[in-house]
Structure formats: structure tokens, C-alpha cells
């Protein structure tokens, strides 16, 4: 289990660094590596010791080659089988357990994405350990920092488990360099198929806009837009900025946009170079998902809106006038 750590305990563990070894579970789409995996590798490197990556899937040779070049990775373990199609946690867990049994890793981690949040609790349960979720900082090999109360407080936890299983908030760690490494690759330990689930199909929505969690610019709308049709104002602005479009929980709950656009504690965590909040009041739940953005611009007609407390630039005005004006100015450039 884990408990709150006393300040004096944070100084220990320097002598343990040489004994650390970490397994990063790579998230990928067979031909491309998920960006959050690079952030997770950086976090794993903070623990000291050797960092290995496990790649499971089908026809994922390109991902293996890319990971071998990533700085900080010592070894890439590869498991290619039809059972790993779709990266189902029911199938990946036995593989991870066999890998852990053979190599005795002290830490197992993945990005705190839907993939990692779905997989790691199952792995931890099978190992009979308590996982630590969504960490934002590593104090020492057994001490981690995560947010609580919708990001309003930080909790430092000391994990005494024999194997530390944790997920990493990608926005809190820089991405590892995609070149400069020279890791070796080898076949991962074999494991039997669980046989309790089967991957059938996946249909991805195609968009010319960047993916929300990886975009450098994000334009988000809230309940102030009043309808889903009015989100076209944001789409037009986003097209000029080559930006992704997000939304507050209030906008999603109102049915303006689908829930995969939600930014916030119960949605997606983003940290773009530029975040433009349009018609968003700034509820705690939303701020928890975007407050790490490099530059925040808020547009709201209410000067007392909480969003202005975290914004670098604020525009107190009617969004239905300001947003079209911004779009027209950008079109002329």
C-alpha cells in the first residue's frame, strides 16, 4: 500500500538507484508510437537504473525501430501475436506478468491515457500491489507526487510495494528525445492467451485538425456558446490556427459536442503552447485539465469569471463578436 511520506523520508533511496529497473508499456497504433510513451520514458529515467520498453501488437516493427532510437531506452522487448491486436488489457496482462517474472523489474509504468488507466489497475491487482495513478513528479524511486481535489492540492505518496506500478501524466514530463539512443531489441517472454476477450474492429474518426492531447494550440468552448451549432465559430478559428477543438464539461453535458472533446479532470488533460478558452467560466474540474498550458487566453463577458484567475490574457467581451473578428484578422495574414 502507499501512505503520505514524511519530509525526512524523501532524502533516502539515493543508494538504491543502481538497483532500479523499469518497464515502460508502450502505447502505439502498430505503425506509430503514441506521444505519451515518450513522456513516460522520461519519467522512468528519473528513477535511475535501466529502462526497458515492452511493445505488444501485430506488425509493429516500425514502432520497435523507433523505440530503439529513443534516448534513455536500454532494451526493447517485442511480442507480436494476433492476441495482442487492439492492446486488450486482458491479453496484455499475462504478458506483462511473465515479463516481470523473468526480469524482476522494480517499476512498471505506462502513460495515464485511456490505455494506461485500463491496463495498469489489472496488472497491479494480479501482482497484489496498489497502483499509484497519474503522477506528476518523482521524488525518489519510492516516492511520487500526484494531484488531488481536482488539482487544487498536491499529494506526496510513499509506495512500499515490492513492485511499483504507476501511470504518468504526460503533460508533466518532457518527451524523451526520439533520436540518439541505441537500444537492443529481443523477443519478450511468451505467455498464454487469456481467451476471455477478442478484438473485433476499430473505426477512427478522421479529422484534418490535430489530436486534442497532442496539439500545440487548443481552442475550447463552454456553455457560453449556447448551442452545438455555435461551435462552428470555434472550428473556423481553429482552422486558422491549425488548432484542436475542445470543450468544457458543461458544454458536453448540454449536448453541444461529443464527450471525446471534453477537457478537464474527467476528460482529457492538455498542456498546449496556447490555450484559448471561449465562453468557459473556469470550474475547478476544467482548470485541472488545462492549467499547465504555456499561455492561456480567456474570452468571457463576465469579468468575475474564475477563468481569468489563471489566464495570461483576458478579453472581457461578447464571444459572438470577438471570435469572428479574430478569425477574419487571421485570414488576412
Swiss-Prot record:
Tell me the residues of the organelle transit peptide: 1-19
Annotated GO biological processes are:
amino acid catabolic process; fatty acid beta-oxidation using acyl-CoA dehydrogenase; respiratory electron transport chain
Q: Which GO terms describe its molecular function?
A: electron transfer activity; flavin adenine dinucleotide binding; oxidoreductase activity
Q: Does the keyword Secreted apply?
A: no
User: Where are the N6-succinyllysine residues found in this chain?
Assistant: 59, 69, 85, 158, 187, 203, 216, 226, 232, 301
Q: Where in the sequence is N6-acetyllysine found? A: 59, 62, 69, 75, 85, 101, 139, 158, 164, 203, 226, 232
Annotated segments matching region Domain I: 20-204
**GO cellular component: a single term:** mitochondrial matrix
Where is FAD bound in this sequence? 223, 248, 263-266, 281-286, 300, 318-319
Alphabetical UniProt keywords = Acetylation, Electron transport, FAD, Flavoprotein, Mitochondrion, Phosphoprotein, Transit peptide, Transport
Q: What is this protein called?
A: Electron transfer flavoprotein subunit alpha, mitochondrial
What species is this protein from?
A: Rattus norvegicus
Which taxonomic lineage does the organism of this UniProt entry have?
A: Eukaryota, Metazoa, Chordata, Craniata, Vertebrata
The encoding gene is Etfa
Amino acid at each position: 500500500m502507499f501512505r503520505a511520506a514524511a519530509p525526512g523520508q524523501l532524502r533516502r533511496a539515493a543508494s538504491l538507484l543502481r538497483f532500479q529497473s523499469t518497464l515502460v508499456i508502450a502505447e502505439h497504433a502498430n505503425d506509430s508510437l503514441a506521444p505519451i510513451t515518450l513522456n513516460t520514458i522520461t519519467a522512468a529515467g528519473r528513477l535511475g537504473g535501466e529502462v526497458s520498453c515492452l511493445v505488444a501488437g501485430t506488425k509493429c516493427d516500425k514502432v520497435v525501430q523507433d523505440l530503439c532510437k529513443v534516448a534513455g531506452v536500454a532494451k526493447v522487448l517485442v511480442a507480436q501475436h494476433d492476441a495482442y491486436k487492439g492492446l486488450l488489457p486482458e491479453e496484455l496482462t499475462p504478458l506483462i506478468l511473465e515479463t516481470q517474472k523473468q526480469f524482476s523489474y522494480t517499476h512498471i509504468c505506462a502513460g495515464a491515457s485511456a490505455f494506461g488507466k485500463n491496463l495498469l489497475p489489472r496488472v497491479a491487482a494480479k501482482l497484489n500491489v496498489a497502483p499509484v495513478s497519474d503522477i506528476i513528479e518523482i521524488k525518489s524511486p519510492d516516492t511520487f507526487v500526484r494531484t488531488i481535489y481536482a488539482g487544487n492540492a498536491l499529494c506526496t505518496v510513499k509506495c512500499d510495494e515490492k513492485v511499483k506500478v504507476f501511470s504518468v501524466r504526460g503533460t508533466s514530463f518532457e518527451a524523451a528525445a526520439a533520436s540518439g539512443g541505441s537500444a537492443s531489441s529481443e523477443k519478450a517472454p511468451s505467455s498464454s492467451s487469456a481467451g476471455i476477450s477478442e478484438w473485433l474492429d476499430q473505426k477512427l474518426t478522421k479529422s484534418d485538425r490535430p489530436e486534442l492531447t497532442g496539439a500545440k494550440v487548443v481552442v475550447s468552448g463552454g456553455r457560453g456558446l449556447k448551442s452545438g451549432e455555435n461551435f462552428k465559430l470555434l472550428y473556423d478559428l481553429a482552422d486558422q490556427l491549425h488548432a484542436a477543438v475542445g470543450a468544457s464539461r458543461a458544454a458536453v453535458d448540454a449536448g453541444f459536442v461529443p464527450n471525446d472533446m471534453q477537457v478537464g479532470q474527467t476528460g482529457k488533460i492538455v498542456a498546449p503552447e496556447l490555450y484559448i478558452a471561449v465562453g468557459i467560466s473556469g470550474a475547478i474540474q476544467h482548470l485541472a485539465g488545462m492549467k499547465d498550458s504555456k499561455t492561456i487566453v480567456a474570452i468571457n463577458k463576465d469579468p468575475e469569471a474564475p477563468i481569468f484567475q489563471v489566464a495570461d490574457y483576458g478579453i472581457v467581451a461578447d464571444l459572438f463578436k470577438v471570435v469572428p473578428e479574430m478569425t477574419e484578422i487571421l485570414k488576412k495574414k
